[in-house]
Amino acid sequence: MASLRKTHPLLKIANDALIDLPAPSNISIWWNSGSLLGLCLIIQILTGLFLSMHYTPDTTTAFSSVAHICRDVNYGWLIRNMHANGASFFFICIYFHIGRGLYYGSYLYKETXNVGVILLLLVMMTAFVGYVLPWGQMSFWGATVITNLLSAVPYIGNSLVQWLWGGFSVDNATLTRFFAFLFLLPFIIAAMTMIHLIFLHETGSTNPVGLNSNAEKIPFHPYYSFKDLLGFIMLLTILVSLALFSPNLLGDPDNLHPANPLVTPPHIKPEWYFLFAYAILRSIPNKLGGVLALLFSILVLLLMPILHTSKLRTLTFRPLTQFLFWLLIADVAVLTWIGGMPVEHPFIIIGQIASALYFTIFLVLFPTAGLLENKMLT
């Protein structure tokens, strides 16, 4: 008689996705980041659920309700620190995941990769609205600056901003709707993740050498389930250590002050994981141009399948493009540094050069190097 997990209508789906799934035998630790993202999403939904039980989405009490969670709620400080730092780890895993996808040519599974880019945009949106909720100085001014970018939309911009704010400035209506969005978005992300996985399981995973691995597959469980478990333990160890020993390390000290519309912080900047995009936004003097560059810095990932010119899928045997890939990583690191710096002389020009290089690598150098390597192969 067949096992229940292979016959039951619901268990069968889980079995085909997590237990009997045929997986390539040679995928490395870089393929762990997907399941780590799943773990991060679960951590964020659970900690967020418990935080929402004690939080009040009102401008007069939001800041003090967060203080109340940390002081008076049983283990509230731990839940809050796990949630705040969990967001940082979510983005660390996302950037590893995207980097893996670029390096090993995973983007050639177009449907999976397109859903992945939509997921990235959703997660960025969620992180932004979540950062506004504690109603500290940087929450308020970050919300004001970023929502104001919509005013760059021709003709309807100003109406759009006021419609989003629910008034003439970031105020109680804005905070309330952002709390509603923050409750809704993670469940949309969870649904999109399912679609992401459905598309992935249509084709199967890539592997480090970029060849078809149908000839040699191994079951996901026990091999990769245990490999993923190692990743889970490592992630949780680092996350809990950070939440216990240095919970404010990645945050902005300005956010420890309650929001004050009359006092502008000296340097308005987002959380560290948005700094590269913020630097690209700031490097263009024109408002609409900056907003478009900001959008395109993420949407350029959608063009990767079109810009893939090489006969080889992965970068494992492509030294030229490998160099460009690591140049891109270094460039994003420079942009992240510039995004946190004040807008003054050396930083402005460095940011503009780094932004130009970012788009040049994606749109010009990657395709050119691919064609050159094809010539070298023939």
Curated annotation (Swiss-Prot):
Major site of localization recorded for this protein: mitochondrion
Subcellular location: Mitochondrion inner membrane
Annotated keywords: Electron transport, Heme, Iron, Membrane, Metal-binding, Mitochondrion, Mitochondrion inner membrane, Respiratory chain, Transmembrane, Transmembrane helix, Transport, Ubiquinone
Details of cofactor binding: Binds 2 heme b groups non-covalently.
Pfam families (UniProt xref): Cytochrom_B_C, Cytochrome_B
Transmembrane segments: 33-53, 77-98, 113-133, 178-198, 226-246, 288-308, 320-340, 347-367
Binding positions (a ubiquinone): 201
Gene Ontology BP terms: mitochondrial electron transport, ubiquinol to cytochrome c
The keyword Transmembrane is assigned to this record: yes
Binding-site positions, heme b b562: 83
Protein's UniProt name: Cytochrome b
Organism of derivation: Nannacara anomala
